[in-house]
Structures are given as structure tokens and as C-alpha cells.
Design a protein with these regions (language model features):
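Short beta-strand immediately N-terminal to the catalytic nucleophile in serine-hydrolase-like folds
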Residues: 13-15, 40, 129
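Short beta-strand/loop motif that positions the catalytic acidic residue
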Residues: 122, 128-130, 134
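Core-facing hydrophobic residues within beta-strands of well-ordered domains
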Residues: 8, 33-35, 155
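Gly/Ser-rich "nucleophile elbow"/oxyanion-hole loop immediately N-terminal to the catalytic nucleophile
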Residues: 1-17
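Alpha/beta-hydrolase-fold serine-hydrolase catalytic core, especially in secreted/extracellular enzymes
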Residues: 150-184
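Conserved alpha/beta-hydrolase "acid-adjacent" motif
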Residues: 135-143
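Accessory cap/linker subdomain of secreted extracellular hydrolases
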Residues: 25-121
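Glycine-rich nucleophile elbow surrounding the catalytic serine of serine-hydrolase chemistry
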Residues: 15-25, 136
Length: 184
């Protein structure tokens, strides 16, 4: 986009939740046109979402590879075009990480960890938005991440507050969910 005739050369990316991993993934390549990213409860890595402090969440073995991966299949002959080697090994990798703490073989999780390459390659800014009551994408995706960015000289700002897995400017949804325990 940044090199198109109609562009001023500056590109930004935004995404929320799992889609919030896309800005991180774009930033890890150090593209000169990517000036800012805005991950809203965005994933710095897929494994880091559900494995931390030596334990995993119950959804860990199947969530991304089983649940999200199944969205590409609807029972028609075009489904074969959606198959790729990573989709096939993904569920096994999730189970092996759940059982043994890491993958048995390959670099499936390393490919899906973006933060280290962002710290090494990205020259733009980051505006982190994170609900501190978010129990879907936990706040550890934003803190200490913001400090790591700043320590590496990446301009980083944050909007953190007491909301769950949602946008901070949706008060009606926030109050509706608070009756459910605010666990997002």
C-alpha cells in the first residue's frame, strides 16, 4: 500500500483479539511504510495467549487450530484449497504443547511468536489498547510488552482500563457484561 501512486507512503494497521495478531505480524518484517500499529487485545504470539507461567488454559489444545481453523471448511470441493501443512499439524502441535509444554518437532509456535522480531525489526510506533479485565486475551499481552517496546526505542503508548474483551468505548456492552462477571 505504501508504494502505490495514490498513497502518501504511510500505512497503519489495527486489529482486535486474534485479528490483533495481524498488526504484530506485519510489524515484525520492518516494512518502512508501516508507521503505526494498533493491536486491541492483540496477540504477541499464538502460544503466549494460552500458555503462561508453566501452565495452559483448558482451551489451549484445540482453540486456534481446531476452532478457528475449521472456519475455512464448509463441506464443498473448494475446502481442499484451504488445506496446508500447518493446518494439518496444528492440532497435534496444540495437544503436544498442552501435554509437554512445547511442540514435539518443528517451529510451529516460533513462527507464530511475533514480538521478538518486532523488537528487532520494527521502526514505527505502537498504540496498545487492552482491557485489564480481559480474560480472553489476558493483559500479559500488553504488560510488560509496552515496557519491552520502550526499552528497545520503539515509541509506544497504551490505553488500559477496567473493561473486558471489548472496545473501550462501548459502555452499553461493558455494563451488560459486567452482570456476567466481566470476564469477557
Amino acid at each position: 500500500l505504501g508504494s502505490q501512486d495514490w498513497s502518501n507512503g504511510n500505512v497503519a494497521m489495527i486489529g482486535k483479539s486474534y485479528d490483533g495478531s495481524t498488526p504484530w505480524q506485519a510489524a515484525m518484517f520492518g516494512n518502512e511504510h508501516l508507521k503505526t500499529i494498533v493491536p486491541i487485545s492483540g496477540l504477541i504470539g499464538v502460544k503466549e495467549l494460552m500458555w503462561k507461567n508453566g501452565s495452559s488454559e483448558a482451551r489451549a489444545p484445540i482453540m486456534h487450530n481446531g476452532v478457528y481453523g475449521s472456519y475455512g471448511f464448509d463441506g464443498d470441493e473448494e475446502d481442499y484449497g484451504n488445506l496446508c501443512p500447518d493446518y494439518i499439524i496444528g492440532p497435534g502441535t496444540g495437544v503436544s504443547a498442552w501435554m509437554w509444554g512445547s511442540e514435539v518437532a518443528g517451529d510451529y509456535w516460533a513462527e507464530r511468536y511475533f514480538l521478538d522480531r518486532v523488537l528487532d525489526n520494527y521502526g514505527g510506533s505502537v498504540y496498545l489498547i487492552q482491557g485489564m479485565q480481559d480474560w480472553n486475551v489476558d493483559p500479559h499481552m500488553a504488560v510488560p510488552t509496552i515496557n519491552m517496546l520502550k526499552d528497545r526505542g520503539i515509541e509506544a503508548k497504551g490505553l488500559f482500563g477496567q473493561w473486558d474483551h471489548d472496545y473501550p468505548d462501548r459502555p452499553i456492552q461493558l455494563s451488560d457484561r459486567s452482570e456476567l462477571g466481566g470476564r469477557g
